[in-house]
């Protein structure tokens, strides 16, 4: 029997458990997505100096709570970055980008001293990419050329109709990739001309994962 009646209750529990891993005061990097939204609603407790947002949606939610949102160009480093994931494995490698904010998420995470990932256990996987497609942000004019390259890597790219990123680009969701070496594949896809970035977060993995399971909260680190 689960401690939580719904998936949302699991997400709320993970968000609450993450607070102790985040700095009080200071500037926090904040990701995007349904789990992060639960966390954002708790952030006033931390009395942050400010936050750097990974998307316009996150920035808007932070501002509604009275939290100042600053441009990343004015920040040298962040004490922590907190975000969810579409998938995460025991190496703390992740697939992200279901909400199409992957590029800004990756940029903000890159200047953080630690990456706190908050998920429910449905996102914990043995191998990335089996159940969730890999999002790739692409400059619009390169969409078809990039898709052909992704096919040559063994993937089945699908154009995410009607979605334009905050950067004005499009998303290809790549199914059936065999992600055995996440670091190498992240590099390979990022080197395709026209790719802005892809949703593998392996070069800069999570520091700790806060995982809500049926039995409660587990804190996991790379194995």
Swiss-Prot record:
Active-site residue list: 105 (proton acceptor)
Pathway given in the UniProt record: Carbohydrate degradation; pentose phosphate pathway; D-ribose 5-phosphate from D-ribulose 5-phosphate (non-oxidative stage): step 1/1
Molecular function GO labels: ribose-5-phosphate isomerase activity
Reactions catalysed according to its record: aldehydo-D-ribose 5-phosphate = D-ribulose 5-phosphate
Keywords: Isomerase
EC number, as in UniProt: 5.3.1.6
A GO cellular-component term linked to this record: cytosol
Functional summary from the UniProt entry: Catalyzes the reversible conversion of ribose-5-phosphate to ribulose 5-phosphate.
Record text on subunit structure and interactions: Homodimer.
Protein name (record): Ribose-5-phosphate isomerase A
Organism: Acinetobacter baumannii (strain SDF)
Underlying gene: rpiA
């Amino acid at each position: 029997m689960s401690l939580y009646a719904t998936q949302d209750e699991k997400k709320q529990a993970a968000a609450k458990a993450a607070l102790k891993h985040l700095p009080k005061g200071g500037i926090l990097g904040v990701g995007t997505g349904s789990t992060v939204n639960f966390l954002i609603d708790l952030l006033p407790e931390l009395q942050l100096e400010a936050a750097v947002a990974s998307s316009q949606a996150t920035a808007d939610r932070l501002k509604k709570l009275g939290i100042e949102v600053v441009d990343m160009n004015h920040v040298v480093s962040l004490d922590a970055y907190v975000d969810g994931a579409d998938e995460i494995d025991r190496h703390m490698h992740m697939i992200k980008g279901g909400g199409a904010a992957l590029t800004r998420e990756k940029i903000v995470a890159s200047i953080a001293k630690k990456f706190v990932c908050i998920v429910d256990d449905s996102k914990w996987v043995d191998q990335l990419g089996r159940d969730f497609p890999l999002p790739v942000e692409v400059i619009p004019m390169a969409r078809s050329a990039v898709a052909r390259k992704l096919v040559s890597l063994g993937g089945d790219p699908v154009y995410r109709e009607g979605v334009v990123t905050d950067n004005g680009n499009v998303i290809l969701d790549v199914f059936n990739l065999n992600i055995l070496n996440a670091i190498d594949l992240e590099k390979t896809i990022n080197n395709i001309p026209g790719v802005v970035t892809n949703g593998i977060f392996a070069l800069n993995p999570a520091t700790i994962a806060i995982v809500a399971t049926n039995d409660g909260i587990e804190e996991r680190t790379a194995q």
